[in-house]
Amino acid sequence: MCVKGIKTETNNILIDTGMGSADLTSNIIVTPNANKLLKNLKRIGVSPRDIDIVLLSNLQKDTVGGATRMDRSGRTIPVFPRAKYIVQKSCYDEIEQGNALRISQLYDKEEVINLHKSGQLELIDGDVEILKGINAIKTGGYSPGNQVFFINSGTEKYIFLGSLIPTPLHLVDNAIPSYAYSLNDAWTAKKEIIKHGLDQGALLIFGRAREKQSGYITEKYGKLSVDFREL
């Protein structure tokens, strides 16, 4: 999984906390190891206290695992002490009310609850403009409150796909992650996001790809292809 970052005039923002870091004012930096997140932030002159916002696609382990850590007393505390962690309310509702087996397999319930207790987890409902040019779009499907992020940076448009279309291989019409909460909703949302990407000429960023993590999509004779680009 890869983490993306955005640096605006007033905010340092991360998208998911699995691995990597980025600065959209220059380029996007991708690293393959979750343990390197803080080191890569340090490399670009950013400390954990400098992070203002963490956008979370959902609350599953591979998305939110880097959001908290144990302190010396054994308490779970946020890694980014000043940040707002933003996620859909229906994602948190699933943690509290969802199928127990699914929760145990895909979530670290205690970690998420402790993050909520810290007061730093902000629950939103539906499509929300986080900041000018940065929008959270609720898709559902993969999880009840799964969200993707539309980012406008000058003339460039980006879509961070997170878990909805995790790799380029999942652009294929019937390729939906088998552990999606609703296969039908995930398929519908996927089609809508792909259409938006085509219409807007947006750069798609695949949130779980280890290689070839971003590119522009084109459609010819009903078939999609990706013009991969380095970030």
What feature does the model see in each segment?
Residues V64-T68, I137-Q147:
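Active-site glycine- and acidic-residue-rich loops that bind
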Residues T31-I86:
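Active-site metal-binding motif and surrounding structural segment of the metallo-beta-lactamase
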Residues Q213-L231:
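Short, basic/aromatic-enriched C-terminal tail that caps enzymatic domains
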Residues M1-K39, R43-I44, V148-S163:
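Conserved beta-strand hairpin/beta-sheet module of binuclear metal-dependent hydrolase folds
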Residues I6, D16, I51, N58, ...:
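Divalent metal-coordination and catalytic microenvironments
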Residues I15, A22-T25, E94-E96, T167-L171:
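Short acidic/His/Gly/Ser-rich catalytic and metal-binding motifs that mark active-site loops
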Residues G20-S21, I29, N35-V46, V79-K138, D185-G201, ...:
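Metallo-beta-lactamase
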